[in-house]
């Protein structure tokens, strides 16, 4: 922090559709680059772990599980970074699929923020795949140990 300000950075990694491992590697690389530049808050695009354009692949259990595995990997491989990091992924909760931002800090998954306003016009079909987080009551906490199974 300098003069009461912190540096924030927005990153747009190269992603491959449904290649969560490649995408996570790019995110991790960019986190370390942003750290070198002094960023303390790092924001990545929605669904950056899977890529936004997965379409019907969002309904594949393998994709959803791999996204969680790579989220844990990102948290673990950035544990030494002193920053608040936000990455996007699809997350199933109580039988519904949400487009969420995951907050990470010092190797921990702090929580998830589900997208509320889902566009459903022109080329955007988010409402076909995702549920709005508007009606979720309270905080949804999913411990990282769930992802180790």
Task: Identify the role of each PLM range.
Residues 1-149:
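Enzyme catalytic cores with a strong preference for nitrogen-chemistry domains
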């Amino acid at each position: 922090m300098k003069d009461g300000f912190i540096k924030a950075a927005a990153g747009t990694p190269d992603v491959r559709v449904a290649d969560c491992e490649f995408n996570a590697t790019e995110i991790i690389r960019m986190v370390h680059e942003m750290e070198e530049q002094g960023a303390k808050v790092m924001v990545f695009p929605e669904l950056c772990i899977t890529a936004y354009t997965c379409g019907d692949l969002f309904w594949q259990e393998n994709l959803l599980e791999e996204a969680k595995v790579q989220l844990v990997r990102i948290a673990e491989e950035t544990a030494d970074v002193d920053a608040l990091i936000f990455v996007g992924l699809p997350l199933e909760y109580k039988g519904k699929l949400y487009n969420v931002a995951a907050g990470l800090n010092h190797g921990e998954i702090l929580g998830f923020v589900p997208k509320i306003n889902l566009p459903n016009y022109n080329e955007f079909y988010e409402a076909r795949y995702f549920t709005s987080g508007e009606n979720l009551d309270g905080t949804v906490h999913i411990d990282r140990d769930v992802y180790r199974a």
